[in-house]
Amino acid sequence: MLTTKKTFQTKFLSTLLILALVSTMILAPTALAAGFGGSSITTAVADSGARNFTPTEAANDTEIQAMTDNRSVLNESDIIYMILTDRFYDADPTNNGTLNQEYRPGQLKYTQGGDWKGITQKLDYIKNLGVTAIWISPPSQNELLSRDGEESGYHGYFTHDYNSADPHFGTKQDLIDLVSAAHSKGLKVILDVVPNHTADYFNGASSTYSSASYQPAAPFNNPDWYHHYGDITDWNNEYQVLNYDLGGLDDLNQDNADARQAIKDAYKNWITLTGADGIRVDAARSMPKNFLQEFESYVGVPSFGEIFVGDVDYVSAFSNYEWGVLDFPLFFQAREVFAHDASFTTVKAIFDQDYKYANVNHLITFIDNHDRDRF
């Protein structure tokens, strides 16, 4: 099922490239104002003969096709700079939020002020790193605070309103301007998307809200659009993985036709509005594979999914349903080799299973991200 395949040597060199780039960033200042915080680098290396994704493969929608002149095509040669928007650069203090509520400078579980204007101002810096694309935090409006008040949705994964921009990042026009400015400098833009869950609004496994005034924005305030089984407690139980809540976050039911359509429409609208070039799908493991395939096709840009598992057989199964996947199996083994003196044969064992992927050139390799401690 594989027509092109990275050699062990090529993929190993790409890993060394990531190590060099990330090491440079770790040595750089981490102050938010300096524009270095909240970011890391991933890469996908090109192989001759590899298939490039084109918009016509995903959708024939006239509106999306009309935008192709302004959109670059995400491909295997891209080096991606990941930005946690809130932690990057604060160019507009007026959108930081309420002091001592969601905005608490220096307290890392709360908003710190980074915004889309901040990324736009630092595009020359990013371009000079030698990267070709940026992957930014989810754009949708997040819940200000978790139910217990112990953290904010600074990261973008506590979705409140799928169809509105998070005011802490800026306006929709600010995001449009960011994508346009990035394109003018030859940089592609990847939006993180969260179709699996909203913030935590329901009482455990109940279909009742914890408060009548604390619920997601319409139309996602319909309890019938959700599973109500409580939290995942057994990650080896696939039924739980697909239908239970991830860390308390309310699990959307993609098998509900109305919910499914609303999710697809929300993100297609973001892509159409901004002209972004691709999407990274959060918690892809926790959604039906047929939904992931349909979602990518409908939105109309290539997607790569987060399957937070080190097993090649498990992760590679998703490669038939999305343009690409994050290479978590390599991530786990590379860290063991370079940080804990494990044998290089463990990395080779990962490379030897490349044939299991639909297109090994669409693996997004990395050793550092926003879900893990710095390498």
Residue ranges, per PLM feature:
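Substrate-binding/active-site clefts of carbohydrate-active enzymes
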Residues: 66, 72-79, 86-274, 289-314, ...
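Sec-dependent signal peptide cleavage junction
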Residues: 23-46
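N-terminal secretory signal peptides that target proteins for export/translocation
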Residues: 1-9
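Short alpha-helical segments and helix-capping/turn motifs at coil-helix boundaries
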Residues: 17, 63-68, 118-122, 348-352
